């Protein structure tokens, strides 16, 4: 056992021995009992609710502990400075965009809340994005101001100067406490519902990233649905390790706990060692909730395999995780079943899989307390309506409905049982528009107002299953349609494969050929012939990869996703095609 974990293990051993590992009972969820009557409007921003939680600890980061009252006061001070700088006489930016670049710490929350308090739309930037992308986001959103943490000031100053956008550096008071109280200027508690709140930029797999503009109502709809379905309470403590420019990191992992008065422990960035230390620490507050992408869970298991080798240590880790942590969630990318099973063996937790995207927040989720089925994304969350459809070549109706459901249940059209189709979503969580792109916004919705996700899905066994992006994950080969994600799930069970991406490569004979891009376990080898022989035992003949490409590493973004269009371009430059079986 590594020395840095020895002390936490000893402390935990005695605390757990004394309690005899009695399972913690998680009581049924009571919706926000601490919320004052004046704040029961479900569409208010999260900072309006902060005063109800006063001196409770909201955040713990490298700078220390920060209460809800402190977050509110510091945010209000910054909001007033923003208004002074921008010259807004009535204290309202009228939805002007405020870009901000902050680390995963208290500065992010203060910048976000201040953007809202001043009447602006928050545009979060990410420090790992290249300068050209940061410039694009600031320019495309037409931000009137850029708020920046001290550590990024030198990097952003030339960029802001070139764009002619004012730069507002954060002061030490944001991190360590205000030296003066904000001017008494109460923030309005009504009128937020339809105002713009945040612009999240999409991954840009079909061109330049688009800014998805969500209102305060949209954000609140996602948050309240998750708070109810996942039983968030003020006693929860979540460990935050994800980037803060996507729905997963911002809404699921930050706004949800702050909505109910819970505590968020923020790491500057992901570290497998630090995550395990937090899981196993006997010091208060102890982690009760964890959410991450599959890549994070994979790296945590790599650390587990290297450092927790003794059986009694593994038993100890499993016991602590089961007793202390009530919920572990995976999302943003498909969760390989072997990874789910290995995590369950190590921690006793079956990861909760869910489905969402930038434009809709969260839409589908496995149950909190009932059985979770690997590979399924469960059923609709509260307030969400979904449809699975196919285009209708006949006049009179825009499409044929295969299945239609909400949180109360799903109705399947006779004759369309277990038929795949495009997933549509409708509800208060669906975004308002693509910023400054009316035509793209219009084409993203059906004529009757449903958002087109671009994902292929199926309803079977009383659950929804995502087959993948229709554009890249549904491969048409020899007259068959096969799911790249399904093939990937099976191939990841091969003992020599550590990562895989399945792509459809244009082919004169088959239309597309199934190509497996594979990263191998260290010291392993794999031929195409061996892979085909193995795959025939788990896949239909037409789904067996006709080509194998071996790579050192499969490129993934910060959320664990593979840009398959870019991967195809990298592996097959214009005019070049490798022969089947290469690798």
UniProtKB/Swiss-Prot annotation:
Q: Does the keyword Lipid metabolism apply?
A: yes
Q: Where is the transit peptide?
A: 1-27
Q: What is its main location?
A: mitochondrion
Q: What class of enzyme is it?
A: ligase
Q: Which UniProt keywords apply?
A: ATP-binding, Fatty acid metabolism, Ligase, Lipid metabolism, Mitochondrion, Nucleotide-binding, Transit peptide
Catalysed reactions listed for this entry: tetracosanoate + ATP + CoA = tetracosanoyl-CoA + AMP + diphosphate; malonate + ATP + CoA = malonyl-CoA + AMP + diphosphate
| Kinase in keyword set | no
Binding of ATP occurs at 202-210, 455, 469, 561
Task: Provide the Gene Ontology terms for cellular component.
Answer: mitochondrion
Molecular function GO terms recorded: acid-thiol ligase activity; ATP binding; malonyl-CoA synthetase activity
Could you tell me the EC number(s) of this protein?
6.2.1.76
A Gene Ontology biological process noted in the UniProt record is:
malonate catabolic process
InterPro entries referenced in this protein's UniProt entry, alphabetically: AMP-bd_C, AMP-bd_C_sf, AMP-binding_CS, AMP-dep_synth/lig_dom, ANL_N_sf
Q: Where in the cell is it found?
A: Mitochondrion
Alphabetical list of Gene3D superfamilies matching this protein = 3.30.300.30, N-terminal domain of ligase-like (3.40.50.12780)
Q: Cross-referenced PANTHER family, in alphabetical order?
A: ACYL-COA SYNTHETASE, ACYL-COA SYNTHETASE FAMILY MEMBER 3
Record family assignment: Belongs to the ATP-dependent AMP-binding enzyme family.
Functional summary from the UniProt entry: Catalyzes the initial reaction in intramitochondrial fatty acid synthesis, by activating malonate and methylmalonate, but not acetate, into their respective CoA thioester. May have some preference toward very-long-chain substrates.
Record protein name field: Malonate--CoA ligase ACSF3, mitochondrial
**The species this protein was found in:** Mus musculus (Mouse)
């Amino acid at each position: 056992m590594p020395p840095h974990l020895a002390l936490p293990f000893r402390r935990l051993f005695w605390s757990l021995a004394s309690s005899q590992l009695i399972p913690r009972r998680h009581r049924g969820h009571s919706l926000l009992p601490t919320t004052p009557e004046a704040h029961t409007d479900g569409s208010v921003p999260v900072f309006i609710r902060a005063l109800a939680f006063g001196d409770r600890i909201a955040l713990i980061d490298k700078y220390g502990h920060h209460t809800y009252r402190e977050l509110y006061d510091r945010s209000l001070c910054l909001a007033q400075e923003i208004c002074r700088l921008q010259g807004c006489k009535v204290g309202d930016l009228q939805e002007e965009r405020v870009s901000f670049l902050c680390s995963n710490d208290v500065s992010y929350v203060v910048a976000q809340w201040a953007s809202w308090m001043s009447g602006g739309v928050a545009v979060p930037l990410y420090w790992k994005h290249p300068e050209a992308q940061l410039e694009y986001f600031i320019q495309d959103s037409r931000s009137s101001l850029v708020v920046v943490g001290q550590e990024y000031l030198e990097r952003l100053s030339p960029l802001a100067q070139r764009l002619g956008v004012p730069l507002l550096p954060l002061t030490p008071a944001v991190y360590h406490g205000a030296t003066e109280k904000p001017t008494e200027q109460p923030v309005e508690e009504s009128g937020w519902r339809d105002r713009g709140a945040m612009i999240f930029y999409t991954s840009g797999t079909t061109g330049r990233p688009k800014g998805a503009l969500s209102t305060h109502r949209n954000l609140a709809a996602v948050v309240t649905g998750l708070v109810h379905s996942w039983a968030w309470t003020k006693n929860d403590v979540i460990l935050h390790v994800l980037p803060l420019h996507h729905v997963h990191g911002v809404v699921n992992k930050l706004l949800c706990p702050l909505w109910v008065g819970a505590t968020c422990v923020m790491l500057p960035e992901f570290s497998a060692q630090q995550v395990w230390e937090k899981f196993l620490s006997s010091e208060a507050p102890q982690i009760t909730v964890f959410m991450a992408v599959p890549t994070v869970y994979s790296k945590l298991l790599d650390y587990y395999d290297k450092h927790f080798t003794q059986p009694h240590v593994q038993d100890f880790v499993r016991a602590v995780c089961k007793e202390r942590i009530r919920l572990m969630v995976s999302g943003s990318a498909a969760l390989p079943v072997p990874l789910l099973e290995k995590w369950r063996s190590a921690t006793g937790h079956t990861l909760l899989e869910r489905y969402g995207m930038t434009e809709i927040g969260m839409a589908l989720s496995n149950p909190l307390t009932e059985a979770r089925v690997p590979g399924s994304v469960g059923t609709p969350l509260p307030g969400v309506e979904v449809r699975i459809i196919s285009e209708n070549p006949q006049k009179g109706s825009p499409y044929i409905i295969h299945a239609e459901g909400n949180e109360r249940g799903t109705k399947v059209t006779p004759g369309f049982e277990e038929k795949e189709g495009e997933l549509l979503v409708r509800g208060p969580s669906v975004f308002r528009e693509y910023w400054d792109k009316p035509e793209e916004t219009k084409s993203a919705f059906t004529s009757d107002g449903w958002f087109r996700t671009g994902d292929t899905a199926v309803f079977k066994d009383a659950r929804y299953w995502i087959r993948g992006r229709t554009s890249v994950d549904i491969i048409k080969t020899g007259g068959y349609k096969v799911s790249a994600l399904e093939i990937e799930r099976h191939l990841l069970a091969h003992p020599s494969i550590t990562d895989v991406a399945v792509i459809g490569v244009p082919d004169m004979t088959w239309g597309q050929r199934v190509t497996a891009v594979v990263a191998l376990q260290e010291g392993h080898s794999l031929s195409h012939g061996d892979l085909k022989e193995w795959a025939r035992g788990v896949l239909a003949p037409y789904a067996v990869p006709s080509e194998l490409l071996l790579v050192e590493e499969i490129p993934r973004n910060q959320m664990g996703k593979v840009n398959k269009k870019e991967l195809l371009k990298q592996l097959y430059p214009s005019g070049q095609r490798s022969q089947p079986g290469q690798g």
